[in-house]
């Protein structure tokens, strides 16, 4: 009986330690967004800076590029890819691991400064894509 009790205790402690130290699946997944920039003909637009603002920053400051939470320049395929949006305090238990990011593309067309924006609500671990037509 004593041996059985000792074996059960060791097995139980091993199980508790294993499950307590394992990572959640969502912790392994980075939260990311790809903004696809295209012109009126659907051709990719490269070299455009896109700014990302978390909900608190957007609500407080708006589209002030100096205060952007993240920024990326679109690549040859017109993609501005934001990875690891969950670094920092953007996703917490306070906001139920959810945050709305506003993405703002600043560009010039026909010698005029323009801005196009899109807001995307994300849960921690999401991977979303949105297209912006720059016209």
Model-predicted regions and their roles:
Residues 31-39:
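A short, amphipathic beta-strand motif
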Residues 32, 47-49, 100-102:
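Exposed beta-strand and adjacent loop surfaces of beta-rich binding modules
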Residues 41-65:
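Short, ordered, surface-exposed loop/turn motifs in non-cytosolic proteins
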Residues 60-87:
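Short, acidic Ser/Thr/Gly-rich low-complexity loop/linker segments typical of extracellular
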Residues 88-111:
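A short, solvent-exposed beta-strand micro-motif common in secreted/extracellular proteins
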Residues 115-135:
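Extracellular beta-sheet/turn segments enriched in Thr/Pro/Gly and aliphatic residues
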